[in-house]
């Protein structure tokens, strides 16, 4: 974060000082990071007192100061130097972050954090910072990681870790930027209409990327049209001096060209796009190879990430980098070196016994499930002798009334793609629908097996996995299959 005094921060967020005099607040500067976990506090930092599932950050204020924080942003006095903001009602857009906020204290601290991030981002933009916003139903984190890699040769980049893209992660990431930051890459998610507009108001992007409109969070939005309208809030937030990158292979995204005042750059797999990919091939590990065309130039691209779906992600990242002044050669080199960064997102590891594990267990929706299954069967059949393919699938959350039909569809798809073994993890109605769909599509014997939990799935794999098999582990994060995938990578086959 930029260097600010406690008094300046109090003025920005509209808070009052507690347990510190005005003179002390004017003299004491926040030179460290802003943290909501007292264990992560750095010397000179600012601690956010937020309510959590098991504890309230206000109870850890003293520990944070002992760890080096110079002040706490809180909703009540905490016995150590603090900026206190008045509690306020939690709003729907913050519900996912503040589900344990019973008195409005968390909503107040979060709103103050947003005001601080907005002030800091405005000052940094005046100093030359370029802000890039990314949204889409799937692929945001992978694209964010690719974009951070291709921008790195051009200057200092700040991007969120993992999928830290909500009402807390967004301003927290903004406050990671300093005067030396050239590019701030922000991933923007939404659970309700207005979420993306709210995030964009904190750090208005001069470059926006819209990847796709799918069915993630369909339960919250009710329709794909409502999802598209919310994703369109990002290009709508870009000024006429900015640039909007649209993946025109998705018709709902292509239609957003009429909803922005900014210049539009179209990317896709057809020659009519501004940045486009020629014929795509995949190697034995499903890593795409293609020729990228842009501005009457072309260059061969060999990606280090896995899956055909990464083509559009990489094109969007490339388009941003080209807009920022990168050469085609710089983009190609950076993409070739940019492997998976964020944990449990298409991480591919091959063990000593030849078993390949595709760990994509952080998140899942119907579109990303389909992409994962296609990558699985490709890896199993390429590179010589056909290998057995295993799909270890958990629940896709937040699909609302479509949950049963979408899980049924994925079970049927696994059979149509000729996945050798489908292990359905979980006992709810959605998981029963996935197993039933596979059986009705033509699965026989033990091709589709339903188990109660991740431990049961791991026990089955330990008993039946053979050298050379290929295993996809995928589910929404709440299913907890990431630990299963980690365990598979770490151990030998047990017969």
Question: Across the structure, where does each feature detected by a protein language model lie?
Answer:
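Residue-level signal for inorganic ion chemistry
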Residues: 9, 45, 64, 116, ...
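Phosphate-binding loop of NTP-binding sites
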Residues: 98-248, 252-260, 463, 472, ...
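Short, hydrophobic beta-strand segments that form beta-sheet elements in well-ordered domains
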Residues: 33-35, 67-75, 243-247, 263-267, ...
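Short, basic phosphate-binding NTP loop
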Residues: 1-133, 143, 149, 451-463
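Extended acidic/charged loop-beta regions that coordinate divalent cations
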Residues: 177-180, 190-218, 254-298, 337-349
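Short acidic/polar active-site loop segments enriched in Thr and Asp
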Residues: 70-71, 182, 206, 420
């Amino acid at each position: 974060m930029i260097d600010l005094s406690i008094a300046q921060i109090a003025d920005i967020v509209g808070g009052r000082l507690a347990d510190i005099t005005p003179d002390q607040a004017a003299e004491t500067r926040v030179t460290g990071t802003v943290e909501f976990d007292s264990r992560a506090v750095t010397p000179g930092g600012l601690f956010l007192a937020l309510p959590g599932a098991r504890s309230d950050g206000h109870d850890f204020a003293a520990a944070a100061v002992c760890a080096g924080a110079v002040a706490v942003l809180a909703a009540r006095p905490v016995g150590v130097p603090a900026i206190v903001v008045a509690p306020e009602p939690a709003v729907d857009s913050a519900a996912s972050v503040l589900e344990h906020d019973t008195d409005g204290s968390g909503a107040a601290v979060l709103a103050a954090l947003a005001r601080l991030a907005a002030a800091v981002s405005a000052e940094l933009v005046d100093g030359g910072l370029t802000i890039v916003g990314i949204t889409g139903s799937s692929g945001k984190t992978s694209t964010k990681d690719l974009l951070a890699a291709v921008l790195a040769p051009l200057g200092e980049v700040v991007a969120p870790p993992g999928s830290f893209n909500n009402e807390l992660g967004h301003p927290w990431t903004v406050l990671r930027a300093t005067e030396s930051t050239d590019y701030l890459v922000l991933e923007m998610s939404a659970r309700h209409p207005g979420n993306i507009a709210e995030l964009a108001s904190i750090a208005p992007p001069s470059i926006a990327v819209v990847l796709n409109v799918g069915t993630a969070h369909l339960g919250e939005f009710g329709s794909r049209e409502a999802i598209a309208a919310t994703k369109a809030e990002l290009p709508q937030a870009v000024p006429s001096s900015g640039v909007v990158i649209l993946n025109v292979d998705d018709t709902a995204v292509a239609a957003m060209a009429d909803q922005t005042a900014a210049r539009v750059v179209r990317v896709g797999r057809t020659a009519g796009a501004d940045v486009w990919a020629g014929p795509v091939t995949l190697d034995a590990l499903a890593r795409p190879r293609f020729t990228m065309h842009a501005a009457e130039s072309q260059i061969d691209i060999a990606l280090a990430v896995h899956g055909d779906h990464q083509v559009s992600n990489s094109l969007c990242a490339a388009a941003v980098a080209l807009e920022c002044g990168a050469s085609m050669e710089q983009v190609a080199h950076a993409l070739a070196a940019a492997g998976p960064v964020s944990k449990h997102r298409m991480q591919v590891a091959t063990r000593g016994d030849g078993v390949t594990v595709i760990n994509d267990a952080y998140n899942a929706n119907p579109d990303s499930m389909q992409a994962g299954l296609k990558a699985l069967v490709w890896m199993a059949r390429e590179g010589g002798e056909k290998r057995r393919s295993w799909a270890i699938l958990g629940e896709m959350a937040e699909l609302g009334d479509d949950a049963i039909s979408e899980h049924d569809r994925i079970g049927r798809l696994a059979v149509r793609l000729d996945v050798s073994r489908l292990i359905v993890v979980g006992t709810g109605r959605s998981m029963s629908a996935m197993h039933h769909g596979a059986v009705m599509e033509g699965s026989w014997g033990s091709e589709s097996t339903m188990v109660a939990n991740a431990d049961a799935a791991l026990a089955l794999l330990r008993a039946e996995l053979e050298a050379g098999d290929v295993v996809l582990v995928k589910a929404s994060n709440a299913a907890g299959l990431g630990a299963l995938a980690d365990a598979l990578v770490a151990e030998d086959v047990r017969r």
